[in-house]
Amino acid sequence: MMLIGEALIGEAPELAHVDLMIGDKEGPVGQAFATGMTQLSAGHTPVLSVIRPNLPTKPSTLIVPKVTVKGMDQASQIFGPAQAAVSKAVADAVEEGLIPKEKAEDLVIIASVFIHPQAVDYNRIYRYNYGATKLALKRALDGFPDIDTVLHEKDRAAHAVMGFKISKLWDAPYLQVALDNPNLPVILNIIKQLPKSDHLILEAGTPLIKRYGVDVISKIREVRPDAFIVADLKTLDTGNLEARMVADATADAIVVSALAPIATLNKVIEEAHKTGIYAVMDTLNTPDPVAVLEQLDVLPDVVELHRAIDIEGTAHAWGSIEGIKALAVKRSSKVLVAVAGGVRVDTISDALGAGADILVVGRAITNSKDVRQAADRFIEGLNKPEIDQFRIMTDF
């Protein structure tokens, strides 16, 4: 048996982060326990957990400092409140029945403990590490989190240290604002006026990228670190190279033209997936998007049904949505459909009713006298609440 648990509790600088393994003495955890006691590392010396001198806790527990111990003050925090907290938490887990008493001699625990170098309050160090150890033990023994929880939470999560989250398109529908004006100061001012929404995508338009190159993505990223940013290159050749350029520029998606050779389309999609970004196929001037898709090795993540600005007086091309989605089901793929060109507030329900997942809007927002109000009207038309808007956040 080898079970793994993790918990973070408290407030800086004394917050506690405990990772632990619990398992049989005769198994891999027991082997790691023995190795830890005999192969010491300067600054990370494992400590046998004792409730007080001459009274080790049961199951036997090894405490491993995560942060390099550089002086006696830090050593005292490990040997003092942290050791006492972990030892007491393990013993209490047995007393409370979390760990079966009859298993106390058969199991061992390895607990990696984080003590911030700026921590000073012994009381907080003890209480936070006690709580984190108990919670990590419970999670390990309960198998928390299960895979369904992981899949549910993975795109909602923002890592506390990183400070921002990488957005993914998993909660359609979305509003995509096309930033086509080739004037960067104007574009950055527009972005600052846009509302913050989980259902807002930013598109670095083709004219903007032609003027400033893909490095314009980093300028947009400075204003909106969390944004999902699409780089509309309308790639026609050198697909893998351009996909890599876009990924290196920190964009989240690259747009390739459906008019490109099939080999180029395949290379864009392959390289996009290698680098962890989305591949978008733009169907501008493509009479039969489904026929193009049927020739691809792997389907793109998004198909954009695009009516050009120069022909916006003509009818929309939303009729292809059903065929695209049917092909995606047949190929066991997930494909989002975006519609662009002439999308207005009064046509939102028509587009969504036809199966659109992303509404691409440009001048109706970017040329508006009140950018925020214009964007808000489209977002309200999506009729989609913010992710976790009504959720009361707990310990994870």
UniProtKB/Swiss-Prot annotation:
InterPro entries: Aldolase_TIM, Fae/Hps, HCHO-activating_enzyme, HCHO-activating_enzyme_sf, HPS/KGPDC, OMPdeCOase_dom, Ribosomal_Su5_D2-typ_SF, RibuloseP-bd_barrel. It catalyses: 5,6,7,8-tetrahydromethanopterin + formaldehyde = 5,10-methylenetetrahydromethanopterin + H2O; D-ribulose 5-phosphate + formaldehyde = D-arabino-hex-3-ulose 6-phosphate. Coiled coil: none annotated. The active site is at residue 17. Residues 162-396 are annotated as: 3-hexulose-6-phosphate synthase. Keywords: Carbohydrate metabolism, Lyase, Multifunctional enzyme. GO terms for biological process: 'de novo' pyrimidine nucleobase biosynthetic process; carbohydrate biosynthetic process; L-ascorbic acid catabolic process. It is an enzyme of class 4 (lyase). Residues 1-161 are annotated as: Formaldehyde-activating enzyme. GO terms for molecular function: 3-dehydro-L-gulonate-6-phosphate decarboxylase activity; carbon-nitrogen lyase activity; hexulose-6-phosphate synthase activity; hydro-lyase activity; orotidine-5'-phosphate decarboxylase activity. Its EC number is 4.2.1.147, 4.1.2.43. Substrate binds at residues 19, 48, 66, 68, 83. Pathway: Carbohydrate biosynthesis; D-ribose 5-phosphate biosynthesis. Catalyzes the condensation of formaldehyde with tetrahydromethanopterin (H(4)MPT) to 5,10-methylenetetrahydromethanopterin. This is Bifunctional enzyme Fae/Hps. It comes from Methanococcoides burtonii (strain DSM 6242 / NBRC 107633 / OCM 468 / ACE-M).
